[in-house]
Amino acid sequence: MIEDELIFVSNNYVKLKEVQKKLGELDVKVTSKNYNFHEQIENDLFCITADKTIIAYDNILKPLIVMDTGFYVENYPNNPGFPGAFIKTNLLDTIGIKGLLENMKNVADRKCLLKECLAYYDGDNFKVFESSQEGTLAYSEYQGTNSDKYTKLFGVFIPEGYSKTVSEMSSDEKDELAKTNPNVLSLFANWYKKERSKCLVKK
């Protein structure tokens, strides 16, 4: 059943604020709850996010959402598509952004893909949203002070059609990017609004 309260399963404070801001426009109250998931094996962002959502609901038993991000560097040396769906374990907790850039320093074709996946489950309704943005990997990391940078990848990801990383973009530029390529949070918010309207009509 569509409710006016949701749990965001994450310990990412900045990402929580983004979710609260977006869903707050619909008067939906969002609180966060951390959950320690077992390590995933399959490198499939859709499956990982969906599995996490079902597992979390079985333990929390309240309407919730789970968000995950995948990053795929097309011509990463000896491992095309690295780091894939395992950004934290394969990249951030190992070689880090500096290691990624070091290993890519002699690669001219720096195409990459940033994917996001959001899953919602309330015990009855189960829905998964996906979005992707093509772009290129920068040669150096932008060390900005953007308070809304919830992933370090924004400091090295240059969206297609732009000449700067996401972290370097102004708020207006980010809004423009979101309009041309809606992220999963926007897709979910639009769906949630429609579903809630249907429930109100039935009442």
Report residues per predicted region.
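Anionic-ligand binding patches
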Residues: 2-7, 14-203
